[in-house]
Amino acid sequence: MSRKREMPDGGAKSVLSDLRFGRFVGRIRRSRHPALLLLALFVAACWLTWVNFSVALPRSQWQQAIWSPDIDIIEQMIFHYSQLPRLAISLLVGAGLGLVGVLFQQVLRNPLAEPTTLGVATGAQLGITVTTLWAIPGALTTQFAALTGACIVGALVFGVAWGKRLSPVTLILAGLVVSLYCGAINQLLVIFHHDQLQSMFLWSTGTLTQTDWSGVQRLWPQLLGGVMLTLLLLRPMTLMGLDDGVARNLGLALSLARLAALSLAIVLSALLVNAVGIIGFIGLFAPLLAKMLGARRLLARLMLAPLIGALILWLSDQIILWLTRVWMEVSTGSVTALIGAPLLLWLLPRLKSMSAPDMNASDRVAAERRHVLAFAVAGGALLLLATWVALSFGRDAHGWTWASGTLLEELMPWRWPRILAALMAGVMLAVAGCIIQRLTGNPMASPEVLGISSGAAFGVVLMLFLVPGNAFGWLLPAGSLGAAATLLIIMIAAGRGGFSPQRMLLAGMALSTAFTMLLMMLQASGDPRMAEVLTWLSGSTYNATGGQVTRTAIVMVILLAIVPLCRRWLTILPLGGDAARAVGMALTPSRIALLALAACLTATATMTIGPLSFVGLMAPHIARMLGFRRTMPHMVISALAGGVLLVFADWCGRMALFPYQIPAGLLSSFIGAPYFIYLLRKQSR
């Protein structure tokens, strides 16, 4: 017996109509602020382009310069072969970065995925650096090198996370670690081949300078092919946005489709890096803003995100041209980061519903260890042994020697300051990493990842530039202020979202990118003071003195003595704000106190060993993976692991290329990153 479908009466129709209209109005209101922002950016880009073109060439000559420039008029030649290609390349690269960002985020279901956070861009840059160092000619050679570097890094990162079904926490951790590793190799090559790679400073920050149309002619067919392949993968990628089981039930060969889409995104990323260098942030920001504008469907995001990326890079480059005329030449990637970081921080509180998989999903660690004291004693003995070996065992002109007696006394004034400096820096960074991870409840948080080390380093470098003469007395306050300001901005930006890991990482990466770009701008400026700073930024203990070590030790002892007093806070805060309030904890004062403590630890360590140490991320994870999750055991084992790691890194740095030295901060990345990747891979099985 057939049943007639009941139709809603007039009142019900009216209610449904009102509900639909209310949802429509709500969508308009949610997208109003980003739309107004885009409109303002578009107007600013058009106005700056008009101003820059008018200064470069009288408007009466624009038509001739565009179609058939007079070779006898230099201004027309510059307009045709430099400014117009630069405008075109900015639009192409911006659109390409927006497209790549959507591809990565859709396939991985991860709002933090983009070429820089996954390490793909850094791998491509490293490949190009190697070809530049070996002076291998040819445009195809650099393209092949960029593709090779990006593919190797991509295979490593995705291979680590594949066993955990591309878990967001594992994927981003692996990407950040491999990116730091490639960056350390790059920095090492620059230190030993500074003159040959001087031009890489400006290029590596992203520069759109063009001398002809060859770059545009080479890039646009490649991007067009990428767009066509993306459209062919539209249905599989739409299904990839669903649960894996649902996608398989709908007939999708999930692994094959995911591999194809990721390969396309990696290839496009490498081609973009080869064209203009690393321009971060756009691949992260453009898809995010497209989603905030209401583009929920994949096809809508694929159309809107490239337009947003092109607009942002267009505006950034026009600002560069204006700054070059009124101040000095800076890289486009630097301005992109400086524009994008405040915009992202402004938009973060407006992300009402930021959907992402659980950051702690399928996160397995070892069972909680007992007999903590025995492990702590063993770790302390290992640290003392590493220190004694670093003091006594080494190389000279005749080979390997074990120093003792008179020889050891002669070597001691040269060795003990740098070894103790490395040890203390490792301990402080490890403890700071533990505090930050517990304060934020985020396993990916650390001084390096959240940009706190970069903020401290920027504060120190800025003080060196602003204060004449001997400014040592101001370095610790400047570094502490930079670190505290960075962490405070991150917590304010992410606080309205309940300190979710996604918001914390977005804010941290925005600030980290901005500080890193500012430091690279100072390096590329040619200022003679930056030659001294470069070694410190790479994490060298070469200039450590007895007086500096003594002062650092006093500060470290005072700061570490405060940590046990905060044990209750550090135990409760990872449970969330509601749990903390339920047990009567004053949430804001405790967070501010822990914020200040972590900032001072980070600043003191950064002054000693620079911002590239990596220990603050790795040491807490090593302790946690070994089974130490309670507050004080976690702190103690992390501190011991950080101290051992940096002492060993400093010794290897002195011995590996004797008589030349590799900075301990860089070498700690070489030592720590492979082991950390191994632990991540082991967890995924």
UniProtKB/Swiss-Prot annotation:
Primary location group: membrane
InterPro entries reported for this sequence: ABC_BtuC-like, ABC_transptr_permease_BtuC
GO molecular function: transmembrane transporter activity
One of the GO biological process terms: siderophore-dependent iron import into cell
Compartments it resides in: Cell inner membrane
Parts of the chain that traverse the membrane: 35-55, 87-107, 120-140, 143-163, 172-192, 222-242, 265-285, 302-322, 328-348, 373-393, 416-436, 456-476, 479-499, 504-524, 553-573, 592-612, 632-652, 660-680
SUPFAM superfamilies: ABC transporter involved in vitamin B12 uptake, BtuC
Bilayer topology term: Multi-pass membrane protein
GO cellular component terms listed in the entry, alphabetical order: plasma membrane
Keywords: Cell inner membrane, Cell membrane, Ion transport, Iron, Iron transport, Membrane, Transmembrane, Transmembrane helix, Transport
PANTHER family reported in the protein's UniProt record: FE(3+) DICITRATE TRANSPORT SYSTEM PERMEASE PROTEIN FECD-RELATED, FERRIC ENTEROBACTIN TRANSPORT SYSTEM PERMEASE PROTEIN
Subunit field text: The complex is composed of two ATP-binding proteins (FhuC), a transmembrane protein (FhuB) and a solute-binding protein (FhuD).
Family membership: Belongs to the binding-protein-dependent transport system permease family. FecCD subfamily.
Functional summary from the UniProt entry: Part of the ABC transporter complex FhuCDB involved in iron(3+)-hydroxamate import. Responsible for the translocation of the substrate across the membrane. Involved in ferrioxamine-mediated iron(III) utilization.
Name assigned to this protein: Iron(3+)-hydroxamate import system permease protein FhuB
Lineage of producing organism: Bacteria, Pseudomonadati, Pseudomonadota, Gammaproteobacteria, Enterobacterales
